[in-house]
Amino acid sequence: GLDRIHVGLETGDDEILKIIRKGVTSAEQIDGGKKAMAAGFQLSEYWMPDLGGRERWRQHAENTARVLNEINPHYIRSRPLVPRQGTEIFEDYRQGRFHISSPHERLEELKLMIEMLNVTGRVCFDHNMNAWTGRNGGTLFHMDYEGYKFPEEKPRVLELIHEGLMVDESRHIDIKELVAMGSL
């Protein structure tokens, strides 16, 4: 039977939820997540680093952490924003109304969100757009399905973010370059 639910939270920020026309509020996301868990489902919530762009990164990180803390899902999965051709956010980016963050700015947003997380589940970076570079040249985070156990491994994740911020930004994947090439 069905025992796991994957939910595209995207953000816990009500302003951004309106901008992207998600059709739900942060309170409704919290309510739905709690109901799914109370019904016995394993819950994976997906959030999108940089969905607020440079303009709203802080409120995006803070409010997403707030919502995730309230829900306390089994899994939190990072899916960094990559604007796709044919979408409104891509057109906003192309027209200069939305500004994609640099790799280090995305790590700063991730750092703030992780610092604010008080959950007892797992935080996962199991998608190729989380492929920031570590100092050894490999990926910064391990990208397996199980991720990092919180709160036990929270300090390790923050250490890895610090490491990523010390790596020259040109060594990280820059979403702007991928969008410009139209490779996604």
PLM region spans:
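A cross-domain feature marking catalytic cores of carbohydrate-active enzymes
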Residues: 7-11, 45-49, 78-80, 125-127
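Conserved non-cysteine loop/helix-boundary elements of the Radical SAM core domain that shape
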Residues: 1-41, 49-71, 92-104
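Auxiliary Fe-S-binding modules of radical SAM enzymes
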Residues: 69-184
